[in-house]
Amino acid sequence: MWRPVQLCHFHSALLHSRQKPWPSPAVFFRRNVRGLPPRFSSPTPLWRKVLSTAVVGAPLLLGARYVMAEAREKRRMRLVVDGMGRFGRSLKVGLQISLDYWWCTNVVLRGVEENSPGYLEVMSACHQRAADALVAGAISNGGLYVKLGQGLCSFNHLLPPEYTRTLRVLEDRALKRGFQEVDELFLEDFQALPHELFQEFDYQPIAAASLAQVHRAKLHDGTSVAVKVQYIDLRDRFDGDIHTLELLLRLVEVMHPSFGFSWVLQDLKGTLAQELDFENEGRNAERCARELAHFPYVVVPRVHWDKSSKRVLTADFCAGCKVNDVEAIRSQGLAVHDIAEKLIKAFAEQIFYTGFIHSDPHPGNVLVRKGPDGKAELVLLDHGLYQFLEEKDRAALCQLWRAIILRDDAAMRAHAAALGVQDYLLFAEMLMQRPVRLGQLWGSHLLSREEAAYMVDMARERFEAVMAVLRELPRPMLLVLRNINTVRAINVALGAPVDRYFLMAKRAVRGWSRLAGATYRGVYGTSLLRHAKVVWEMLKFEVALRLETLAMRLTALLARALVHLSLVPPAEELYQYLET
């Protein structure tokens, strides 16, 4: 045991045993600093300090902000980052396509004759590369990009076939989201999870579209329903995607002045915004069902409003096959010609009479099923995009169609002018999707080996004139043309079992008669003279229409005979225009 005196002597001995005193901290610091190499002793520039702080501090601050944010704010922060990625991908695709066309037309094909096989082969390959790039970019970006890609399919007489064939894959392809996102959206809109609202809910989507995906579910009363769930980030990214597309279209216009489609995007802004409102879609569906109620074969799924919101739409589940799936249609024992006739009549009723027009009737939105009477029923889906055509425009359109059949140039010019179009012949051909003047066709095109497919050549050679006509039209007419063209394409896919030209023309005149009757009701009354006048006009039109149809069929048969005799080259596109 140490005593206090012994401890003091021990510590004193330790202190006196050191030869040198302990250096002070200041001396130690100065000695080490002086020993550093010169390059490390120079002061750090201010800009480097700021940059280092920003590089290290900014991610830390953003990360902390993200961790502390609520779920909805986290999603918006992710959207900013994802938006930069979408912009980069879109810019890459736009530049790739533009430079590819520039290289082909100005370098590879310089001095090559435009209609030569080599020219057509190179351009076809260029078109295919561009279409593949568009599809890949649209699928990667999703949402609005897929929707616009689907819209391009309807321009199948303005765009090369490589585009329309390739872009059709977008009708059924879109991004699919996980169950966590579905749960998050239901909690935001209903403050409940899907399994709390429904007796059964399948998180695996049965279909995925450009704006939403569809889930199978069952209500508590056992009713099978389809639940359309919007992608949760679409509303937040809508404005950014629109601005990106506007920028890219302007860039393309600078490089290719004749390709001026930015005005189309401007006009579609409002309609696309409407499609994001599923409550509006539900109201559209109910109005469509009311206005087509006199067609017993048209089915519109009933909306369940207590399970719907602006981002969720619940409606009756209706099974069926696509309207262009000929094998599935025949396997049900249904007649293809019956389906084609019903399809044309239903949409012609909207165009020429009600004016409330389904603007996206692609095959994925029209299903076919067997009804109680054993005949086909048409199930109309996706009522988000509708266009209303004013009565004066409907009347002008009906009378223009009638004037085309009667070959009344003065009336054609007058009614086209009422729609704001000056080049009435070109507009008539765009509207009818077939040549208007058979004499002109026969004299200058049918016997020409270079221009056998008249309508295809018209679209390519007069691209700027076609664009001018589209700009002159009332904006609702753009979606009307899309409807007409889509229905025509479905009729072709079914093998053109009915005369679309004949059915549309009859509906146009009937629509004009009903509109005129509503306008002058109480003025002319039901006098015998007025009735006789209506009967005479209808009879005159019926005769002219049947003669026109017969002339078209004879022309197509004669063209095929000339091809068989090797007097003219094959032109399947021409036959389709003459027969469908």
UniProtKB/Swiss-Prot annotation:
Transmembrane segments: 50-67
SUPFAM superfamilies, per the entry: Protein kinase-like (PK-like) (SSF56112)
Pfam families tied to this protein: ABC1
Keyword list, A-Z: Kinase, Membrane, Serine/threonine-protein kinase, Transferase, Transmembrane, Transmembrane helix
PANTHER family the UniProt entry points to: AARF DOMAIN CONTAINING KINASE 5, ABC1 FAMILY PROTEIN
Main location: membrane
Superkingdom of source: Eukaryota
Subcellular location: Membrane
Recorded family membership: Belongs to the protein kinase superfamily. ADCK protein kinase family.
Topological type in the membrane: Single-pass membrane protein
Domain Protein kinase: 179-419
Biological function: The function of this protein is not yet clear. It is not known if it has protein kinase activity and what type of substrate it would phosphorylate (Ser, Thr or Tyr).
One GO cellular component term: membrane
Gene Ontology terms for molecular function: protein serine/threonine kinase activity
Protein name according to UniProt: Uncharacterized aarF domain-containing protein kinase 5
EC code(s) of this entry: 2.7.11.-
